[in-house]
């Protein structure tokens, strides 16, 4: 059966994957302007794609001149036994990536969450603060691509250290934070403020797979890339790993490499149809492939296919 599966995903129109709206360019400029007020930078990224899609521009414009912590969030969605390999590979690629934490912002007792502030404080105290040496409070900037959990991290840290809720707006749609916000107090002693920032992608995504991996974990908005394309890439990844849990989920008889077959079967399994206007003005009833694609994508994002490190092929 595996011989029938694709071994390479076909190249798609790069325009579908290059999403850099105006607020991202403006946000990057605002972040650079606020750097003089910042003592430490925390970069948040999705643990499922630790080697894909990080904005390398941050290193040259934001994080390269300040103490830096890389937080790999949503660690509950990957096998914890792989964390060591992820760290080793990241440090092979970037000698500056010395401080890496894995977090789950939905769990306040998470060991990584507990380590964030002590580590940041240690890095700040051991650094040369230059123009901020006489400042008693600490200011930490939170950066990253869209929808990796930056605002969630701020909220869980604020709730943990101040026991207050409602620090920063959180949403499941990429790009909800659009401006560099005012300082958000998250600790009284020591006095610590965080700066939330908009998720910012590179203006040009490196390649098809990088873009689709970002899309699969919601760093790109689904409708801009196309739900059926994202579902097709998911099918490709699952087949490549021999993960056939989608067969039962989508009402199939056996694994397949055809996304059309998956979505038609899925819409029938879900009993979902859509009325489509025919060329002669009449309406015909067809399987709702879009809804089936959304169902399949949501199943992945909620863990129905198990814990998956999407970048596992980069460790070979």
UniProtKB/Swiss-Prot annotation:
This entry's Gene Ontology molecular function terms read:
GTP binding; GTPase activity
Does the keyword GTP-binding feature in the UniProt annotation? Answer: yes
One Gene Ontology term, aspect cellular component? mitochondrial inner membrane
The record's subcellular locations are:
Mitochondrion inner membrane
Task: Provide the membrane topology annotation.
Answer: Peripheral membrane protein
GO BP terms: namely: mitochondrial translation
| Start and end residues of each CP-type G domain | 28-203
Name the PROSITE patterns on file.
G_CP (PS51721)
**Keywords (A to Z) from UniProt:** GTP-binding, Membrane, Mitochondrion, Mitochondrion inner membrane, Nucleotide-binding, Transit peptide
So where does GTP get bound?
73-76, 147-152, 199
Please name the Pfam families in this protein's record.
Answer: MMR_HSR1 (PF01926)
Q: Which PANTHER family match?
A: MITOCHONDRIAL RIBOSOME-ASSOCIATED GTPASE 1
What does the similarity note say? Belongs to the TRAFAC class YlqF/YawG GTPase family. MTG1 subfamily.
Purpose: Plays a role in the regulation of the mitochondrial ribosome assembly and of translational activity. Displays mitochondrial GTPase activity.
In Swiss-Prot or TrEMBL terms, this protein is called Mitochondrial GTPase 1
């Amino acid at each position: 059966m595996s011989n029938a599966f694709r071994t390479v995903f076909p190249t798609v129109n790069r325009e579908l994957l290059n999403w850099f709206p105006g607020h991202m360019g403006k946000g990057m400029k605002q972040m650079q302007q606020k750097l003089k007020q910042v003592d430490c930078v925390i970069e948040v990224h999705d643990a499922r794609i630790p080697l894909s899609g990080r904005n390398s521009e941050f290193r040259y414009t934001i994080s390269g001149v300040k103490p830096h912590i890389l937080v790999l969030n949503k660690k509950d969605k990957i096998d914890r036994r792989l964390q060591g390999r992820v760290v080793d590979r990241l440090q092979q690629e970037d000698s500056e990536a010395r401080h890496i934490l894995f977090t789950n912002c939905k769990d306040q007792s998470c060991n990584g969450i507990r380590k964030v502030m002590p580590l940041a404080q240690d890095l700040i105290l051991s650094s040369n603060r230059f123009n901020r040496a006489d400042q008693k409070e600490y200011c930490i900037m939170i950066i990253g691509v869209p929808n990796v959990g930056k605002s969630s991290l701020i909220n869980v840290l604020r709730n943990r250290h101040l026991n207050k809720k409602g620090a920063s707006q959180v949403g499941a749609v990429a790009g909800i934070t659009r401006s560099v916000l005012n300082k958000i107090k998250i600790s009284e002693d020591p006095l610590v403020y965080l700066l939330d920032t908009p998720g910012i992608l590179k203006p040009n995504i490196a390649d098809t797979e990088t873009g689709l991996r970002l899309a699969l974990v919601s760093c790109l908005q689904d409708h801009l890339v196309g739900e059926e394309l994202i579902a097709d890439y998911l099918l490709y990844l699952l087949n490549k790993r021999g993960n056939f849990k989608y067969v039962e989920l989508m009402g199939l008889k056996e694994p397949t490499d055809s996304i059309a077959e998956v979505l038609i079967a899925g819409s029938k399994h879900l009993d979902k149809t859509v009325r489509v206007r025919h060329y002669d003005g009449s309406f015909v009833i067809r399987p709702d492939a879009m809804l089936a694609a959304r169902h399949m994508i949501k199943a992945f994002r909620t863990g129905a296919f198990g814990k998956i490190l999407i970048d596992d092929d980069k460790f070979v």
